[in-house]
Regions:
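Ferredoxin-type iron-sulfur electron-transfer modules and their immediate structural context
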Residues: 1-154, 202, 241-267, 282-284, ...
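Short beta-strand to alpha-helix junction loop
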Residues: 117-125, 195-207, 221, 225-231
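Alpha-helix C-terminal capping/helix-to-coil transition sites in glycosyltransferase folds
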Residues: 236-237
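Rossmann-like dinucleotide/flavin-binding elements
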Residues: 156-181, 220-232, 249-250, 267-328
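Long, low-complexity, intrinsically disordered polar/charged segments
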Residues: 144-158, 169-196
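Rossmann-like dinucleotide-binding cores of NAD(P)H-dependent redox enzymes
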Residues: 177-215, 219, 303-350
């Protein structure tokens, strides 16, 4: 374990958030890092439980409990507490191909399962993970690791979102020749075009793509399989094709065809294209009265983006009743309240 009495000696300390007023003025990350001393103290709170539910990744009564990747959380928390970043990195990479992504946008199911959270506050697992992987990149510990030998198998991966990149990562490590097809100008899928810049900077995705390329993965961008490349041509060139295209079609809504109505991912994509200076539909909330329908993570992302585009007003319609759970504010609602002086959410609205 970390420090035997760490969970008693240290209280949970999250990364300090920048002020809401400062955040809405730019696209920079939401939080500031802790000092190394405080980060190691946070890892020292891990108790190395006899049954580490944080890494269980099991389904119980229809709900997922713990990390679905089975990350060796107590092990790398202990190594981080002792200042052994390289050892912590090795244990982290044992189960997680892209910690720099999950440490930024994962819902942290590990923390919800943390035993320490039953009597106090859970360990800052997600932020500890981010500290390990960013230390590794900053100190040149993340070096290309191409396979020592290659097979004669050629594999096509269609789609370069999280699933496609994961498939490419593991298949390449096994020595196969992997080519990833992506219809957009840049790889990454929703990592690049769906998650807003302040939550997952584009440079973080590009850094990983560069590492994969150095390890031998080939990316063919601006290539839509079925349009630019026929299935027959794909079958002729490759021994196997894995389709990781994601869910592209939203649920139909009766008012979706009305003017000025956009699905969340279309809006977020347009914002990403604008930041990347890529051609695309000119969709912006600048100077507009904006209404958001829905209450999920995508809705919160749309709130944050609309604020940064200087919308004139913002209202979020939520069909659920107001409860302690639904009323909990995230960073987006803190920002909205800072800008407009009131909660933008309207509950029990159909």
């Amino acid at each position: 374990m970390g420090k035997p009495t760490g969970f008693l000696d240290y209280t949970r300390m999250d990364c300090p958030a920048r002020s809401a007023e400062a955040r809405v003025a730019d696209w920079a990350p939401l939080d500031l890092p802790l000092s190394e001393k405080n980060r190691r103290r946070q890892s020292g709170r891990c108790m190395d439980c006899g049954v580490p539910f944080c890494q269980a990744g099991v389904t119980f009564d229809g709900a997922l409990l713990g990390c679905p990747l089975h990350n060796l959380i107590p092990e790398w928390n202990n190594l981080l507490w002792n200042g052994n970043y390289e050892g912590a990195l090795q244990r982290l990479l044992k189960t997680s191909p892209f910690p720099e992504f999950t440490a930024r946008v994962c819902p942290a199911l590990c923390e919800k399962a943390c035993v320490c959270g039953r009597v106090s506050q859970p360990v800052t697992v997600r932020e500890n993970e981010l500290a390990i992987i960013e230390y590794a990149f900053e100190n040149d510990l993340m070096q290309p690791m191409p396979p020592a030998a290659r097979s004669d198998k050629r594999i096509a991966v269609v789609g370069s979102g999280p699933a496609g990149l994961s498939a490419a990562y593991y298949l390449n490590r096994r020595g196969h020749h992997v080519t990833v097809f992506e219809r957009d100008p840049l790889p990454g899928g929703l990592l690049t075009y769906g998650i807003p810049e302040m939550k997952l900077p584009k440079r973080i995705v590009a850094r990983r793509i560069s590492l994969l390329e150095q390890e031998g993965v080939v990316f063919r961008t601006n290539c839509c399989v079925g349009r630019d490349l026929s299935p027959e041509a794909l079958a002729a060139e490759f021994d196997l094709a894995i389709f990781c295209c994601g869910a592209q079609q939203p649920r139909p809504l009766p008012f979706a065809e009305a003017g000025g109505v956009f699905y969340a991912l279309d809006y977020l994509r347009a914002s990403a294209q604008s930041l990347l200076a890529q051609a695309g539909p000119a969709v912006t909330a600048a100077g507009k009265h904006v209404v958001l329908v829905g209450a999920g993570d995508s809705a919160s992302d749309c709130v944050s983006v609309a604020l940064r585009q200087n919308c004139r007003s913002l209202t979020q319609l939520i069909r659920k009743p107001r409860t302690a759970s639904t009323e909990k504010r995230d960073h987006a609602h803190e920002e909205a309240e800072a800008v407009f002086g009131a909660d933008i959410r309207r509950y029990e609205t159909q």
